[in-house]
Swiss-Prot record:
CC terms in the record's Gene Ontology section: NADH dehydrogenase complex; plasma membrane
Protein name: NADH-quinone oxidoreductase subunit K
Family, as annotated: Belongs to the complex I subunit 4L family.
Location in or out of the cell: Cell inner membrane
PANTHER family recorded: NADH DEHYDROGENASE SUBUNIT 4L-RELATED, NADH-UBIQUINONE OXIDOREDUCTASE SUBUNIT ND4L
Underlying gene: nuoK
Main localization of the protein described in the UniProt heading: membrane
Species lineage: Bacteria, Pseudomonadati, Campylobacterota, Epsilonproteobacteria, Campylobacterales
Keywords: Cell inner membrane, Cell membrane, Membrane, NAD, Quinone, Translocase, Transmembrane, Transmembrane helix, Transport, Ubiquinone
Residue ranges crossing the lipid bilayer per the database entry: 2-22, 28-48, 63-83
GO biological process, one term: ATP synthesis coupled electron transport
Keyword presence, NAD: yes
The keyword Cell wall biogenesis/degradation is assigned to this record: no
Function: NDH-1 shuttles electrons from NADH, via FMN and iron-sulfur (Fe-S) centers, to quinones in the respiratory chain. The immediate electron acceptor for the enzyme in this species is believed to be ubiquinone. Couples the redox reaction to proton translocation (for every two electrons transferred, four hydrogen ions are translocated across the cytoplasmic membrane), and thus conserves the redox energy in a proton gradient.
Membrane topology per record: Multi-pass membrane protein
Length: 100
């Protein structure tokens, strides 16, 4: 039987992987993927704790996070496509050109 501690350890590992990806990558798509890993780690934690406490609030909150993440990715990928068409790169350092 997998205990709550195993799920929470998985959450911490996934959260660290996502945080490492955000801090170390300079590609905009990799930043989006790392953000999704962070959000999925949090979702696993909410569902695991909700299941452990026999409460549906964890699952409901995880569904809201999934919906918000989907809208974030939809808007973000649209902006990335426009950015790539204009600059022909997905490197985050090119965002410094936006200084007004």
């Amino acid at each position: 039987m997998i205990s709550l501690n195993h799920y929470l350890l998985l959450c911490v590992i996934l959260f660290c992987i996502g945080l490492f990806g955000i801090l170390r990558r300079s590609n905009i798509l990799m930043l989006f993927f790392s953000t999704e890993i962070l959000l999925n780690a949090i979702n696993i934690g909410f569902v695991a704790i909700g299941s452990y406490l026999n409460d549906l609030n964890g699952e409901i909150f995880a569904l809201f996070i999934i919906a918000i993440a989907a809208s974030e990715i939809a808007v973000g990928l649209g902006l990335v496509v426009i950015w790539y068409k204009k600059h022909r790169t997905l490197d985050i350092t090119t965002l410094q050109n936006l200084k007004g």
